């Protein structure tokens, strides 16, 4: 997510 995890790139 845009402000959920540092790996938001993998989420969306």
From Swiss-Prot:
<feature type="modified residue" description="4-carboxyglutamate">
    <location>
        <position position="8"/>
    </location>
</feature>
<keyword id="KW-0800">Toxin</keyword>
<keyword id="KW-0964">Secreted</keyword>
<feature type="modified residue" description="4-carboxyglutamate">
    <location>
        <position position="4"/>
    </location>
</feature>
<dbReference type="GO" id="GO:0005576">
    <property type="term" value="C:extracellular region"/>
</dbReference>
<dbReference type="GO" id="GO:0044616">
    <property type="term" value="P:venom-mediated paralysis in another organism"/>
</dbReference>
<keyword id="KW-0027">Amidation</keyword>
<keyword id="KW-0301">Gamma-carboxyglutamic acid</keyword>
<comment type="function">
    <text>In contrast to other conorfamides, this peptide does not show activity on human and mouse sensory neuron-specific G-protein coupled receptors MRGPRX1. In vivo, it causes hyperactivity when injected intracranially into mice, and when injected into the foot of the fresh water snail P.paludosa. It also causes paralysis when injected into the foot of the limpet P.opea. Has no effect when injected below the rear part of the dorsal fin of the fish L.reticulatus.</text>
</comment>
<comment type="similarity">
    <text>Belongs to the FARP (FMRFamide related peptide) family.</text>
</comment>
<protein>
    <recommendedName>
        <fullName>Conorfamide-Sr2</fullName>
    </recommendedName>
</protein>
<dbReference type="GO" id="GO:0090729">
    <property type="term" value="F:toxin activity"/>
</dbReference>
<feature type="modified residue" description="Isoleucine amide">
    <location>
        <position position="12"/>
    </location>
</feature>
<keyword id="KW-0528">Neurotoxin</keyword>
